[in-house]
Every structure is written in structure tokens, then in C-alpha cells.
Amino acid sequence: MQSNMQLEPNFWQTKSLLEMTESEWEALCDGCGKCCYRKYIQGRSKRQKLYYTRIACNLLDVETGKCGNYSERFNIETDCTKLTKKNLPDFHWLPDTCAYRLLYEGKTLPEWHPLISGSPHSVKNADILIKNGIHERDVIDWFEFIIDEDHTFK
């Protein structure tokens, strides 16, 4: 997440996702860390179900929702996913609260989003962070940590 100091005010309302600079794109991230929690897919084709877990990437600080080594994450965690302007349509599993997903779907940012609230603490204060996260290295059975199921997975 970038500082708002160098960004145009309300850029997300005046620019499309494709028109945004790299700094603007990064600033859209609210820092909830939900994309860094593991997902589990069960079934095939129309019977596929996506399960969200409270199992976090080993780099994620589960208290703050921030990556412990953001600049090197792709080198350290081989399955770390890079969300870009071009591959965003493939990320239908992003949480309903994700700014990238919201803007892609033509929706507005929530009041607690740091770009709206002006506070980097608003995500935590709004109770958006996943509670009782556990690192992947500490997990044996993923099924014990399922927290939600998305029935709309395609």
C-alpha cells in the first residue's frame, strides 16, 4: 500500500483500472491481507466450490495483514499470486471487500477503505482482517481452518 501523498485525489473515480499508474494501482490495496490467505477448491466443473481458510502465507503478518517481505515476495513464496491490471478478470476469488474487485465490478470503495477514510488503521478498526490467522507452516489439516465457502465459484 502506497502513501496517498503523491496520488491525485479520488483517482479511482476518474480513471479506469487500466489507466492507473503503478502507484495508484498499489494504493487500491486496503492491506487486509485476505488475498494472502489460502483457498481450497473442491470438486470439478459446475460442482466446484471455493473454500476460504484462515491459513496465511508464511510471509503475512496475521496481526496487521501486511506482507513481511513485500518487495521479495515472489522470489520467496513461489505460489504468491501477482494481481495485475491484465489478469484481474481471472481473480474471481478475490473477497467481496477487495477494492480491485469492487472497481472492476463498477462498485464504490467502502467507507473504511484507507483512500476514503484517510487512515491506514481503518481496515483493522472496521474489523475486516481475518481473525485467528495461522501460518501455513503450522498447519497439518486444512479442513480444520475453513472459514467460508463461495458458492459462486466458476
UniProtKB/Swiss-Prot annotation:
A Pfam family recorded for this sequence: CxxCxxCC
InterPro entries reported for this sequence: Puta_zinc/iron-chelating_dom, UCP006173
Entry's family note: Belongs to the UPF0260 family.
Matching HAMAP family: UPF0260 (MF_00676)
UniProt name for this protein: UPF0260 protein NTHI1811
Species whose genome carries this gene: Haemophilus influenzae (strain 86-028NP)
Lineage: Bacteria, Pseudomonadati, Pseudomonadota, Gammaproteobacteria, Pasteurellales
